[in-house]
């Protein structure tokens, strides 16, 4: 019903509440423009390795342009989900997964990063499952991404989600990960 609008309304129906194995409650929800500070703080607190694995460069924080692009999204053509928990009545971002629809309109490219201290607790798995479900529901047929060959935790996660992992033809320091939705 909103296809005629330039900016689609916030997809409140995509908000999901879940619990980690350690009993901590988290919310997975689409990012909002007002999450800019949350996203910037999250990125700043990532280790240099996590930043490098996510951005494939050694950034310290998001530029204003990146922050705008990452938080003011067009929910029709892309999606960004954040995992948050409450800490003393403030939201804390634990991870973010996003996709952007490719020009072919049938596939999308994804990115994922989870805060260092929250890795190996199922957050990346939950974010990716939710993201893949949204992409599938929107008629996308394929999700793909690039992962550095030495990012073993991410490659393990991709395999556990049944992504095909293959060497990147032009660069052996990168693996291509693909799944048919």
Over which residues does each language-model region extend?
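Long, contiguous binding/interaction regions
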Residues: 1-181
């Amino acid at each position: 019903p909103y296809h005629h609008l330039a900016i689609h309304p916030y997809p409140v129906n995509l908000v999901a509440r879940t619990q980690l194995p350690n009993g901590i409650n988290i919310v997975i929800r689409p990012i909002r423009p007002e999450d800019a500070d949350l996203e910037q703080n999250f990125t700043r607190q990532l280790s240099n390795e996590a930043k490098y694995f996510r951005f494939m460069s050694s950034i310290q924080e998001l530029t204003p342009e990146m922050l705008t692009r990452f938080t003011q999204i067009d929910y029709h053509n892309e999606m960004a989900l954040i995992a948050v928990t409450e800490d003393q009545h403030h939201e804390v971002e634990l991870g973010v997964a996003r996709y952007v629809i490719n020009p072919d309109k049938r596939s999308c490219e994804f990115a994922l990063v989870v805060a260092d201290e929250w890795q190996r607790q199922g957050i990346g798995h939950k974010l990716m499952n939710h993201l893949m479900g949204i992409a599938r529901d929107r008629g996308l047929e394929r999700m793909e991404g690039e992962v550095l060959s030495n990012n073993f935790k991410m490659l393990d996660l991709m395999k556990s989600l049944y992504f095909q992992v293959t060497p990147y033809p032009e660069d052996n320091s990168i693996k291509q990960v693909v799944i048919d939705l």
